[in-house]
């Protein structure tokens, strides 16, 4: 530096220190340290802390309040503190002091960077004794070996992962962890190590004066030092906890990019920033986690539409597999990150909700937003109001409706910036469509700032939907893989050709040689069609019924060559083994015969664990063919090279064009296949009807709001009055005019007008005691007001079907007279769904046998319900019964027996055999009971007379939701972890959410059988998200408790500022 220039005083960052373990290994101070120059005083004070800490082998966990001072440079710049610290350094050089502490270990300074909210030390205590000795090694392992895409995050390692790192190539040194490298023999030393070595090479000074001074004043200085440190520790606690520097840098960079994206998205310019107004990190995450490097042209066009930039409502439609979901995800991320608003995504089925939760949790962890599940019995009403981060709610149709109601009731709907609806065409499908219509109508009516995006592959009357949603429309015929449609009549295959006179042209004849026996067993020539593609390519065979799926799978295996058994034989054996583990030693006999050939069936008769396992095996190519029902086409994405429709029927109903398009849309896998094929098998008698099917327009989407009376228009009116959206007849009529039904009223209404239907529905609700009519004004029609009764409030809060609300009230009221709590049977009966009971038909012999095995107390429950053993015995014997018994009560009690047995045994297979019911049906019954139990709980919360049920139903709902041993429940809270997987994780040492949140996906893959990398990453991400949600909720509750009450007496007076300030100080301390 040239003379005359100002000298730069460099601030030296200070490592965290732990005085008790460093004394014996400190290097002696240099002469420069004893006689500091004027311009190096700060460096000398800081230099006394930069000492060599010893080798990592002796590292041990030492937590003290001194760790808080590591990042506070200002503490070291005080000359007085530096002097005190220097005196202490000299005192520690005394021989007796060194001897006394000669055996002390040192703390690994690198491990300070691992001190996040999730600590490894809590995991070590839960490990087996023989593995705990490796616990200290794990604190250094935060870099996974051979990072896969999406696995580049830092994970703390729980005890169950020790076996992975005992392998030499997986050791900390092999992984390249800088915290475990030794300085000796290392040609590339870190800057810190070089600095330490430069001090240790200096000659030792004379310490006579410091020794005498330290010996005489050690006690006084120690007391003074402790007092100062105690005071500073108290001040430090009020600060934000220190995080690793790398995390701060990442968050700062992300925050800066989000700020730039906010300005870009609000700017009228067409320049959208790095990635459609989003940080470049979003683009990187799509590459890492999903392998998406570039968007399709139509996706870019859609995202840059002027209507999208102006946040207008949008409907877009493309063929299946066209990439619709990616556009919706980018729009959701814009809302969450750039506009800082919550988002609601509505999906049709629970399985799809869970799949989407798993895939988006990694984005939430990296980008700083919550992903919350609202499906089945999961979901909190009203949702937690987050302090800083925003929430992405992923919900089924029913849960989305309850969520919107809760947001309207708490005046928080304005926080919802975007609603995304997948499979928008479902608005025209029965009661679920009516609920979806009500949800969207309420959002449109009560919030002018919430944007709605709807997408579907099968839409016809888009104009009606546009009018309802006030939306723009975008469509494209893009498919990443070309689809060729064929028809098979006898042995001839025709290609669908819209230009041909009869809609099809000749393609080819089947050349497969059939024996006479094979022709009888396989009249549709399925063996010939599937052997053209399997086992090298995948194939889906859609069948009319569940039983037909199983029969076709077995038939194919009988006539396939034995060579198919050798294809990926080892992996298929592993699938059988996994099925056996899921079934507690039992495997479906059909699957046991078909899986070795690479074939399986897929329908609702499987348990969710079995379905998930078979879907994963199919996706990875272990299974090459699935025989399935039409529900697979609308469920999870399982594409195939060839799709075969066994018949143009679903059960006994002829196929609709919407259903046909969804099924054939599964043909062709983007990035894998160059083309996709669909073949519809038909007989001559159905030929004309099939030609109309493939060439005709899609079915019109119509409102079911009035057709579904109790679940539709009545439930809508009750909630409108309960939420105070509308109170008078005129307001309700105005609301109805803006619904999808209001848009289509000219088409749908033949006999009554919309006004007459509105009046009739309100009168019916009043007669049932759900509404009460107030005095009317001069204009008795429009100005007639209504208010909701307590029963009505409970019904709409609990989302109870109004056809059963009065029955539920009577059952709960009767239960109070003699509730049997010695067992769960009585409570289970009260929470067994009414609609499932109406559809069931008991096996009377099984019913009689199970009744006889009840204890006297449990039989007393049946007696209270009016069902006697003699009645069931007569029904089992086929005798006539003169005594009239309510059929619904009898059926409901039978289903209660099934649920009661399941809760006691927690084994679907044994209960399935006991009651002669499909295991999939039993699991669906369990899920329905858990959901209805949650509804009954909310119903009881609104009625004081049912206070006794509240605590009882909370526990029952939890038991029905998980139906496993208590120790597995914490693991099953993680999305995507079902009973079989939870058992594997528990046995491997993962006992809590904290374990999973800190897990290394690579170690999970090696530790847990049949777990893919993708699944491992999703489990870890979902666990992290759940843990963050819980931590955020607890922090919010704590802040709420410490917040100064707004209605505190005296706040309005002249001395309120002083009083408020004083009260705030007390609260925060």
Swiss-Prot record:
A motif (DEAH box) lies at residues 422-425. Residues 131-140, 179-196 have a biased composition (Basic and acidic residues). Pfam families: DEAD, Helicase_C, HTH_61, POLQ_helical. InterPro entries: DEAD/DEAH_box_helicase_dom (IPR011545), Hel308_SKI2-like (IPR050474), Helicase_ATP-bd (IPR014001), Helicase_C-like (IPR001650), HTH_61 (IPR046931), P-loop_NTPase (IPR027417), POLQ-like_helical (IPR048960), WH_DNA-bd_sf (IPR036390). Residues 157-172, 197-210 have a biased composition (Polar residues). It catalyses: Couples ATP hydrolysis with the unwinding of duplex DNA by translocating in the 3'-5' direction; ATP + H2O = ADP + phosphate + H(+). One of its GO terms (biological process) is DNA metabolic process. Residues 305-477 form the Helicase ATP-binding domain. Single-stranded 3'-5' DNA helicase that plays a key role in homology-driven double-strand break (DSB) repair. Involved in different DSB repair mechanisms that are guided by annealing of extensive stretches of complementary bases at break ends, such as microhomology-mediated end-joining (MMEJ), single-strand annealing (SSA) or synthesis-dependent strand annealing (SDSA). Possesses both DNA unwinding and annealing activities. Forms a complex with RAD51, stimulating HELQ DNA helicase activity and ability to unwing DNA. Efficiently unwinds substrates containing 3' overhangs or a D-loop. GO terms for cellular component: nucleus; single-stranded DNA-dependent ATP-dependent DNA helicase complex; site of DNA damage. Keywords: ATP-binding, Chromosome, DNA damage, DNA repair, DNA-binding, Helicase, Hydrolase, Isomerase, Nucleotide-binding, Nucleus. Its EC number is 5.6.2.4. This is Helicase POLQ-like. Signal peptide: none annotated. Residues 525-717 form the Helicase C-terminal domain. ATP binds at residues 318-325. Disruption phenotype: Mice display Fanconi anemia-like phenotypes, characterized by subfertility, germ cell attrition, interstrand cross-links (ICLs) sensitivity and cancer susceptibility. GO terms for molecular function: ATP binding; ATP hydrolysis activity; DNA binding; single-stranded 3'-5' DNA helicase activity; single-stranded DNA helicase activity. Its main location: nucleus.
């Amino acid at each position: 530096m040239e003379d005359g220039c100002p000298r730069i005083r460099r601030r030296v960052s200070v490592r965290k220190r732990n005085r008790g373990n460093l004394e014996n290994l400190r290097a002696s101070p240099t002469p420069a340290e004893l006689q500091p120059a004027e311009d190096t005083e700060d460096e000398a004070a800081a230099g006394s802390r930069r000492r060599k800490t010893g080798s990592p082998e002796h590292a041990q966990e030492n937590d003290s309040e001194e760790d808080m001072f590591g990042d506070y440079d200002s503490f070291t710049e005080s000359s007085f503190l530096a002097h005190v610290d220097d005196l202490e350094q000299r005192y520690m050089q005394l021989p007796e002091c060194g001897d006394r502490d000669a055996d002390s270990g040192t703390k690994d300074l690198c491990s300070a960077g691992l001190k996040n909210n999730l600590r490894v030390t809590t995991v070590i205590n839960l490990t087996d004794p023989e593995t705990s000795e490796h616990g200290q090694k794990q604190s250094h392992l935060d870099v996974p070996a051979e990072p896969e895409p999406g696995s580049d995050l830092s994970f703390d390692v729980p005890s169950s992962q020790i076996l992975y790192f005992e392998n030499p190539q997986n050791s900390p040194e092999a992984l390249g962890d800088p915290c475990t490298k030794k300085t000796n023999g290392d040609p590339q030393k870190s800057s810190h190590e070089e600095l330490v070595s430069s001090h240790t090479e200096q000659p030792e000074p004379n310490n006579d004066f410091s020794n005498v001074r330290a010996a005489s004043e050690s006690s006084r200085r120690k007391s003074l030092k402790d007092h100062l440190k105690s005071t500073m520790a108290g001040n430090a606690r009020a600060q934000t906890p220190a995080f690793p520097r790398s995390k701060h840098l990442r968050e700062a960079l992300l925050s800066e990019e989000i700020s730039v994206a906010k300005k870009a998205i609000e700017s009228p310019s067409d320049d959208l920033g790095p990635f459609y107004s989003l940080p470049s990190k979003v683009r990187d995450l799509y590459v890492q986690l999903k392998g998406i490097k570039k968007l399709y042209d139509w996706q870019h066009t859609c995202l840059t539409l002027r209507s999208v930039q102006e946040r207008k409502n949008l409907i877009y439609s493309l063929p299946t597999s066209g990439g619709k979901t990616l556009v919706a995800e980018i729009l959701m991320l814009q809302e969450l990150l750039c506009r800082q608003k919550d988002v609601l995504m509505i999906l049709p089925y629970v399985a799809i909700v869970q799949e989407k939760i798993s895939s988006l949790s990694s984005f939430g962890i990296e980008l700083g937003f919550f992903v919350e599940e609202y499906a089945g019995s999961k979901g909190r009403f009203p949702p937690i109001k987050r302090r800083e981060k925003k929430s992405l709610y992923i919900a089924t149709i029913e849960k989305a409706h309850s969520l919107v109601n809760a947001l309207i009731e708490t005046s928080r709907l304005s926080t919802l910036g975007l609603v995304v609806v997948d499979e928008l065409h479902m608005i025209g499908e029965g009661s679920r469509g009516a609920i979806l219509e009500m949800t969207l109508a309420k959002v449109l009516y009560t919030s002018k700032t919430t944007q709605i995006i709807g997408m579907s592959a099968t839409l016809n009357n888009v104009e009606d939907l546009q009018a309802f949603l006030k939306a723009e429309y975008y469509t494209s015929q893009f498919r990443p893989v070309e689809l060729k449609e064929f028809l098979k009549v006898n042995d001839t295959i025709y290609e669908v050709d819209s230009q041909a006179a009869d809609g099809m042209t000749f393609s080819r004849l089947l050349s497969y040689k059939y024996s006479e026996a094979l022709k009888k067993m396989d009249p549709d020539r399925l063996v010939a069609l599937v052997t053209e593609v399997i086992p090298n390519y995948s194939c889906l065979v859609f069948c009319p019924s569940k039983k037909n799926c199983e029969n076709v799978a077995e038939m194919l295996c009988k006539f396939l060559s034995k060579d198919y058994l050798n294809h990926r034989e080892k992996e298929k054996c592993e699938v059988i083994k996994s099925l056996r583990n899921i079934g507690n030693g039992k495997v479906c006999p059909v699957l046991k015969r078909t899986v070795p050939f690479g074939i399986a069936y897929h329908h609702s008769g499987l348990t969710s664990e079995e379905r998930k396992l078979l879907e994963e095996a199919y996706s990875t190519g272990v299974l090459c063919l699935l025989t399935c029902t039409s529900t697979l086409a609308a469920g999870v994405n399982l594409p195939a090279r060839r799709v075969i429709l066994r018949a143009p029927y679903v059960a006994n109903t002829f196929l609709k064009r919407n259903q046909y398009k969804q099924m054939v849309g599964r043909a062709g896998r983007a990035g894998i296949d160059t083309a996709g094929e669909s073949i519809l098998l038909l007989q001559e008698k159905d030929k004309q009807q099939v030609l109309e099917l493939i060439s005709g327009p899609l079915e019109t989407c119509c409102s079911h709001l009035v057709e579904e009376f109790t679940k539709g228009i009545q439930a809508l009116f009750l909630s409108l009055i309960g939420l105070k959206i509308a109170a008078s007849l005129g307001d309700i009529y105005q609301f109805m005019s803006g619904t999808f039904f209001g848009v289509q009223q000219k088409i749908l209404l033949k006999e009554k007008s919309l006004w007459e239907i509105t009046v009739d529905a309100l009168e019916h609700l009043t007669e049932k005691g759900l509404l009460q009519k107030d005095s009317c004004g001069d204009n008795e029609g429009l100005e007639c007001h209504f208010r909701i009764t307590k029963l009505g409030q409970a019904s709409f809060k609990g989302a109870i079907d109004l056809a059963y609300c009065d029955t539920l009230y009577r059952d709960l009221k009767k239960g109070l007279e003699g509730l049997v709590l010695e067992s769960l049977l009585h409570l289970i009966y009260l929470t067994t769904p009414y609609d499932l009971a109406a559809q069931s038909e008991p096996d009377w012999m099984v019913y009689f046998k199970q009744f006889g095995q009840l204890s006297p107390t449990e039989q007393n429950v049946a007696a209270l319900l009016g069902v006697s053993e003699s009645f069931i015995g007569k029904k089992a014997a086929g005798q006539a019964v003169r005594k009239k018994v309510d059929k619904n009560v009898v059926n409901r009690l039978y289903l209660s027996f099934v649920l009661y047995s399941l809760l006691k045994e927690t084994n679907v297979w044994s209960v399935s055999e006991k009651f002669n019911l499909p295991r999939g049906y039993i699991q669906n019954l369990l899920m329905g009971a858990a959901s209805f139990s949650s509804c009954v709980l909310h119903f009881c919360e609104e009625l004081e007379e049912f206070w006794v049920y509240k605590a009882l139903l909370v526990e029952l709902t939890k038991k029905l939701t998980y139906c496993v041993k208590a120790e597995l429940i914490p693991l099953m809270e993680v999305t995507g972890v079902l009973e079989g997987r939870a058992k594997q994780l528990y046995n491997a040492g993962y006992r809590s959410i904290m374990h999973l949140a800190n897990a290394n996906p690579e170690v999970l893959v090696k530790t847990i059988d049949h777990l893919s990398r993708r699944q491992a990453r999703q489990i870890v991400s979902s666990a992290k998200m759940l843990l963050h949600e819980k931590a955020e909720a607890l922090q919010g509750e704590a802040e709420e408790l410490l917040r100064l009450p707004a209605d505190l007496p005296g706040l309005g007076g002249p001395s309120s500022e002083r009083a408020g300030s004083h009260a705030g100080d007390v609260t925060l301390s």
